[in-house]
Amino acid sequence: MQKYVQVRVFKDVPRSEEEYKMMMETIPDMIKKVYDANDYILTYLIDDEIVKGDVYVAPYGKQSRIVAVEREADESDIKPEINYRPLTRKIDNILER
């Protein structure tokens, strides 16, 4: 069953799965600081269990972005006129490193 989830969107860096993995190998503390300072939240659909800190590739306009799960969305976060898109694939959990 699909659920709505709130995610933190990495707008500038990392911009791809490859860039995320490279940065987590070389400068993981910087990625965690970017995550902690990030307040750009969007809502997506998810089929998986909602686990805070799970990192996914997500559609973002005509591109994709790296996002980290924050929490399950409240009903007040969901607008019926918006067509929410599902997260593409899980790649990591930023809080378990």
Q: Can you name each region flagged by the protein language model?
A:
Residues 25:
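Extended active-site and interfacial segments that coordinate phosphate-rich ligands
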